[in-house]
Amino acid sequence: YGDRRYCHRDDPAAEGGYYMQEEIREVVEYARALHITVIPEIEMPGHSEEVLATYPQLACSGKPYVNKDLCIGNEETFEFLKNVLSEVIELFPSEYIHIGGDEADKASWATCPRCRTRMRQEGLEDVDGLQSYLVHRVEVFLNGKGRRLLGWDEILQGGLAPDATVMSWRGSEGGIAAARAGHQAVMTPNSYCYLDYCQDDPTREPAAAAAFVTLEKAYSLDPAPDSLGVDVVPMILGVQGNLWCEHVPTGEHAEHMIWPRLMAIAEVGWSLPERKDYDDFHARVLDAVAWMQERGYHPFDQKNAVGDRPESIEPVLCLSTGKPVVYHTPYS
């Protein structure tokens, strides 16, 4: 607290927990001892409702609870981001700083006088270009601090910043496009790597964001197929599993969602496709799950999995003669 710019005790707009600086340093050091690098993510310009509730002057409307995105036409937005990122850089020694960049609504920018002025001054054709303008400016700031910018694949929209690394979540296409353009990429396609998705029959599983990523589906990912070519494959750094916690209120629930699917994602990351063997992997997973359960952890009980059940979508009789029919797998 004290003279910190954006942290105020008893702010009525503040809710939930927080980390003290010393606690963050403790987490970073603990991870370092385990050879893990903690990469912080400060979301921008979208997913900013909580910022705009407290600092409504950074919204296009100037009001709280109206806009979802930071106002890019407002120079104060960039001052705010620089100050926040400066504190983050001080606390996290990671080479990369993740700036989010995903799911910006952008609707308010199209009618915001300040954003439209910014677009005209910078020769930007559309709101995608406006987001790209922000990403470029933030990258210049991070590079000046000796750090590199990492963002979700939406940062491709409007033109990718020169040194940006792309984390591809809406499929693999964004990561492939970035790699072909000479940028590094991390593959984390949601249909393989999202651990907040249900992993089995949702009628038997706890709440989840969506369905359906089985252990076998996660294991089947090929993040860097040889068909991409010798110039592209080296630009793909690896894979990442994501657990978003809107529907995961407890540590036990988190363990259930993570394990054993994170084992599949890890093995995808370090294994050549021709060396992968799902049957062998599955047998090892059953042993690992039993080991976890014996020690009081809460993994998904893989031995009782229902699985994809492809036989349930084989058509037997259809009354729509001569009409196209699409069959979806259960829970998808």
Where are these regions (language model features)?
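Short, well-ordered coil/turn elements that cap or connect secondary structure elements
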Residues: 33, 144, 161, 180-182, ...
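Substrate-binding cleft of carbohydrate-active enzyme catalytic domains
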Residues: 1-147
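Flexible, acidic glycine-rich loops studded with aromatic residues
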Residues: 148-154, 159-164, 169-313
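Disordered, acidic Ser/Thr/Pro-rich linker "stalks" and the adjacent N-terminal cap
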Residues: 311-332
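Solvent-exposed, flexible loop/coil residues
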Residues: 48, 52-55, 59-62, 74-76, ...
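Short, solvent-exposed coil/turn linker segments
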Residues: 20, 71, 126, 214-215, ...
